[in-house]
Regions:
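Transmembrane beta-strand segments that form the barrel wall of outer-membrane beta-barrel proteins
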Residues: 22-32, 42-56, 84-94, 119-127
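Predominantly the C-terminal beta-signal and adjacent terminal strand-loop region
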Residues: 113-147
Length: 147
């Protein structure tokens, strides 16, 4: 199992290395689970989100990757932007046995004007597929700094 986690982390590092200025963010995600959040913008509307986090309650490592799309027309702050985002992704839980599921991230991200930061809130329903089929819901708040 650890070989798979190391392979996934290596793949993420490769993807991050192709990022260009201002499109790659790293930050903290707090909630269930808590850890590190990465975002790689593809354009103004689409991005890849990656997470490596630890579940305090269940003592499990979470590794996730999502493809998200942003809708800028719902919320209109007076300064900056605040799109609603939604997408699809995958999650692996690593403990004694591997647990694999499909995620549907739903969130709001605030991007202050003139900064290299974003702040986000998300709820992520997840359909676990292996080793058993069941539904999970994770939630978190966080921020990222963009390079």
């Amino acid at each position: 199992m650890m070989k798979k986690v190391i392979l996934l982390i290596s793949t993420l590092i490769f993807l991050f290395s192709i990022a260009y200025a201002g499109n790659f963010g790293v930050g903290i995600i707090a909630g269930e689970p808590t850890g590190i959040s990465f975002r790689l913008w593809q354009n103004k509307v689409n991005a890849f989100d990656f997470g490596i986090a630890w579940s305090i309650d269940a003592n499990i490592l979470h590794v996730s990757v999502d493809y998200v799309t942003h809708n800028y027309g719902i919320f209109k702050p007076t300064s900056g932007t605040m799109p609603f985002y939604y997408g699809i992704g995958l999650r692996i839980l690593a403990k004694d046995n591997a647990n694999f599921g499909v995620r549907v991230p739903l969130g709001i991200i605030f991007i202050p004007k003139g900064t290299t930061l974003d702040f986000f809130f998300e709820i992520v329903p997840t359909l676990n597929l292996v080793p058993a089929t069941n539904l999970d819901v994770d939630g978190a708040v966080g921020f990222r700094y963009y390079f």
